[in-house]
Design a protein with these regions (language model features):
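C-terminal helix-loop subdomains that flank or include functional centers
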Residues: 39-45, 163-302
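Structured, contiguous alpha/beta core segments that scaffold functional sites
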Residues: 2-193, 197, 209
């Protein structure tokens, strides 16, 4: 379950995940000489594109034969970002047989070779929203820095304790409970920052659009449940559960669980740990928690 959770997180972040099946020697001391190695998609040599021997071809590090079947994956020995940590490491990719690599990604169109991160459709909107939020924060900080403005014709008189900045400009400060007498002609005008209305509503609208682009509900994306009731949150969760069930039964079970199970059984039978008879497996996905079990049961009965 831990490997599956890590794979799904990588699917969300990077759009795809590689699982390399490694067979081990008997002297490694493993009950079954088989291990799984999870690899980030950065291990795949995306610059490897062109023709391959035997009439095949390579697209972004994935090699196909003449019939379009996946034949090999061109992988770096280490993560490209960690080459500097290993003196002997090289950025020369090597082909790994496709039978030893599970390439997991959500296919959105026929002929798709690589996965797409979930947040790719909204990445520009997220950047713009972050810039707007930063600009709003800077505006608030600037407004908070100006407490009052002193007007008058006498520049020598000060109000309160006076200091100077690096350029010699006078800066005065206020203290709690301070009482100060003004000289004739002096006046103090306190800053009244203008309120930028609609900030919260604008953020909600943008986050709604981002949630729709990702394929989630606003509540699941933000964790804000202040505007929902039982019916609305249940309706939103129904669509989310349908998507998760499709991910479980159309991607994880056929693309990960079943191939790993078959390789595990074959390896165990090869070393005599299991009988040679066929062994089947049934898959059970984690159940979804009910928002309100009593209301859910009543709704199912009706």
């Amino acid at each position: 379950s831990g490997l599956q959770a890590l794979i799904v997180r990588t699917l969300v972040e990077s759009g795809e995940c590689l699982v390399r099946i490694r067979e081990r020697r008997a002297e490694d001391g493993l009950p079954v000489p088989l291990q799984l190695q999870l690899l980030e998609p950065d291990h795949l040599d995306a610059s490897k594109t062109g023709e391959a021997p035997g009439g095949g071809f390579i697209i972004q590090g994935v090699e196909f034969d003449a019939l379009g079947r996946r034949r090999a994956y061109w992988l770096y020995p280490v993560h490209p970002g960690e080459v500097a940590m290993f003196r002997r490491a090289s950025l020369t990719s090597q082909p790994v047989p496709a039978s030893s690599v599970l390439h997991l990604f959500d296919r959105l169109r026929p002929g798709q070779v690589r996965g797409v991160p979930w947040f790719a459709p909204v990445i520009l909107k997220l950047r713009d929203l972050d810039d707007y939020d930063d600009a709003e924060l800077v505006r608030k900080k600037i407004e908070a820095c100006f407490a009052a403005f002193v007007t008058g014709s006498d520049d020598e008189e000060t109000l309160g304790r006076a200091t100077s900045d690096a350029d010699g400009r006078r800066i005065e400060s206020f203290e709690p409970g301070m009482i100060e007498y003004l000289a004739p002609g002096k006046d103090v005008k306190f800053a009244t920052p203008s309120h930028a209305g609609g900030y919260g509503e604008y953020m909600r609208v943008q986050l709604h659009a981002i949630a729709a682009g990702v394929g989630l509900t606003y509540e699941l994306l933000t964790g804000d449940l202040s505007q929902v009731n039982y019916s609305s949150i249940r309706a939103g969760l129904i669509e989310f559960r349908r998507r998760m069930e499709a991910l479980q039964w159309q991607l994880l079970v056929p693309g990960l669980c079943r191939p790993v199970w078959q390789r595990f059984i074959a390896t165990s039978q090869a070393i005599g740990a299991l009988p040679a008879d066929p062994i089947d497996a049934e898959w059970t996905a984690p159940r979804f928690e009910a928002v309100d079990p009593l209301k859910d049961i009543q709704a199912d009965i009706l």
